[in-house]
């Protein structure tokens, strides 16, 4: 049976994965709606207004359910991860509060104006509202990813032994954290690809069915053009993310690449292999010479540190952490010796490694050799899940590049809809961005283990004092509710996608033309 920590992790993972089924589509469709409405305002063509209103229906369904699934996640920090909230709440809470007060209210206010302001606002005013919806959704992502980036790379903070908490020392440094910035642009770009692929695939289906061709063709063209820029951005920014990972998250990088030994620079990239955690080796490997070293370090003479060497470093830091913990106990018991304080300040960077021993003993300073060795093994994540999830993400990314690039080529050649196989590829490719983003988030979060806050707070000591029954009950309840939300989303999405622009009831589209003489929009 899973223990309390594992159950808490599982619950958060499930709610986060459910929530992130909705987030990328919101990010991507918001900008696509803004682009469509801008074309409408500039050209005056009714069809672009119809496109904005129809795709806006699907955006609205997704937005509402995304908000609903996101609410419980923040509450979990207090209910399931109370020590985490106590230990780092002053830092982690700041960007989340800003997101709620500024970005979310901006987004939600203007979403209402987007849907109900068509007959109350001028064309330019409504277009500005749509752009503000897009801006608000991206600002929400920015502040959430600033918080998440700090969990990965906890700069701009310092441990205060008097309060037993991490405290912020520089807000600007927190916001400009390079890991947070790279995660932000990579994540929102993946959302843009998701939105583009969603519209591309449904538009392709309309053309395959021979209906609403003018509407579908224009939607396809905008989605392919926007998607082309987005998918190239995702790949470039993914490379930048790998470079940052090699700089500040060496353990995660080595685990993703199943890099057990430190290879001579530049390291080879393992295209495919079978990692064996127990033997600390790969049973089978197909490698591309020099590729990993060049991608991860952007040099030919800097090595990528292997997991075995990293574990040696971690063992040393665990032993230093034991000393830091012993000094902390002296300070907490009232010692005023300046030498003790100075020594603690010089060693507190390794205190988190000492806390890895809390899983095995309450008295960290007196841990046995066997416990130290076990904590050292715990200092790296499970390799195989990360290794394969990363490759699934990359494979989906390059499949998306191929589909979107071919679609964009058909747009610039003015041959949209001529290749039935391409339309089918666009339709069947709709799930690919979701697979990629879910795999990517798994890599980001699972790869940080065993840390809740990188090298500061182990996951094993960050949880609340709940019972297994509490967690199982709440998990079943939340996941059951989220499953109902997902079913509702799929039902409504399929319903309105099948109706297409006929759902606008303008009399201009497929299901209405048999009973009206109104001409199709142009």
UniProtKB/Swiss-Prot annotation:
Span-the-membrane segments of this chain are 16-35, 55-69, 97-114, 129-146, 187-203, 220-235, 391-407, 424-441, 473-487
Q: What is its EC number?
A: 7.1.1.7
**Gene Ontology terms describing biological process:** aerobic electron transport chain; oxidative phosphorylation
Residues on the membrane's Periplasmic side span: 1-15, 70-96, 147-186, 236-390, 442-472
Going by the UniProt record, its keywords in alphabetical order are: Cell inner membrane, Cell membrane, Electron transport, Formylation, Heme, Iron, Membrane, Metal-binding, Translocase, Transmembrane, Transmembrane helix, Transport
Protein name, UniProt field? Cytochrome bd-I ubiquinol oxidase subunit 1
Q: What is its main location?
A: membrane
This protein's membrane topology, according to the annotation, is: Multi-pass membrane protein
Q: In which pathway does it act?
A: Energy metabolism; oxidative phosphorylation
Q: Which organism is it from?
A: Escherichia coli (strain K12)
Its GO CC terms are:
cytochrome complex; membrane; plasma membrane
**Protein encoded by which gene:** cydA
- Which residues participate in heme b b595 binding? 19
What does the record say about activity regulation?
Answer: 90% inhibited by cyanide and 2-heptyl-4-hydroxyquinoline N-oxide, at 1 mM and 40 uM respectively.
């Amino acid at each position: 049976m899973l223990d309390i920590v594992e159950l808490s992790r599982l619950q958060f993972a499930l709610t986060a994965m459910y929530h992130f089924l909705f987030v990328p589509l919101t990010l991507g469709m918001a900008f696509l709606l803004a682009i469509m409405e801008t074309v409408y305002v500039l050209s005056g063509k009714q069809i672009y207004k119809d496109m904005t209103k129809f795709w806006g229906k699907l955006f609205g369904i997704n937005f509402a359910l995304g908000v609903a699934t996101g609410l419980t996640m923040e509450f979990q920090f207090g209910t399931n991860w109370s020590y985490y909230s106590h230990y780092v709440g002053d830092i982690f809470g700041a960007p989340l509060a800003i997101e709620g007060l500024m970005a979310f209210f901006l987004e939600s206010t203007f979403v209402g104006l987007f849907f109900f302001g068509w007959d109350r606002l001028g064309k330019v005013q409504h277009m500005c509202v749509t752009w503000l919806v897009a801006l608000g959704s991206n600002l929400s992502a920015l502040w959430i990813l600033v918080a998440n980036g700090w969990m990965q790379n906890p700069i701009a903070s310092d441990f205060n032994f008097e309060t037993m908490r991490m405290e912020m020392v520089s807000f600007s440094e927190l916001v400009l954290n390079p890991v947070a910035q790279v995660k932000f642009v990579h994540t929102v770009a993946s959302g843009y690809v998701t939105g583009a692929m969603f519209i591309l695939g449904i538009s392709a289906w309309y053309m395959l069915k021979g209906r609403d061709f003018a509407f579908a063709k224009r939607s396809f063209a905008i989605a392919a053009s926007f998607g082309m820029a987005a998918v190239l951005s995702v790949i470039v920014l993914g490379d930048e993310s790998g470079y940052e990972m090699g700089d500040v998250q060496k353990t995660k990088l080595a685990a993703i690449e199943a890099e057990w030994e430190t290879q001579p620079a530049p390291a080879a990239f393992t295209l495919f292999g079978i990692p064996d955690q127990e033997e600390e080796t790969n049973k089978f490997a197909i490698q591309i010479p020099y590729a990993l070293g060049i991608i991860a370090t952007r040099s030919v003479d800097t090595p990528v540190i292997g997991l075995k060497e990293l574990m040696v470093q971690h063992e040393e830091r665990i032993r230093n952490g034991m000393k830091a913990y012993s000094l902390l106990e002296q300070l907490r018991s009232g010692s005023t010796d300046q030498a003790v304080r100075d020594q603690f300040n010089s060693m507190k960077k390794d205190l988190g490694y000492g806390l890895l021993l809390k899983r095995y003993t309450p008295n960290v300073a007196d841990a046995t050799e066997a416990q130290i060795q076990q904590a050292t093994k715990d200092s790296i994540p499970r390799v195989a899940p990360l290794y394969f999830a990363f490759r699934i993400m990359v494979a989906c990314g390059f499949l998306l590049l191929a589909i979107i690039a071919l679609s964009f080529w058909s747009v610039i050649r003015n041959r949209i809809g001529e290749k039935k196989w391409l339309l089918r590829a666009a339709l069947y490719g709709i799930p690919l961005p979701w697979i990629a983003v879910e795999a990517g988030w798994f890599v980001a979060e699972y790869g940080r283990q065993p840390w809740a806050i990188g090298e500061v707070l182990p996951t094993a000591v960050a949880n609340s004092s709940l019972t297994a029954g509490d967690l199982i009950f709440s998990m079943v309840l939340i996941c059951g509710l989220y499953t109902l939300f997902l079913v509702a989303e799929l039902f409504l999405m399929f319903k309105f996608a099948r109706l297409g622009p006929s759902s606008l009831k303008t009399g201009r589209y497929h299901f209405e033309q048999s009973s009206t003489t109104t001409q199709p929009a142009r």
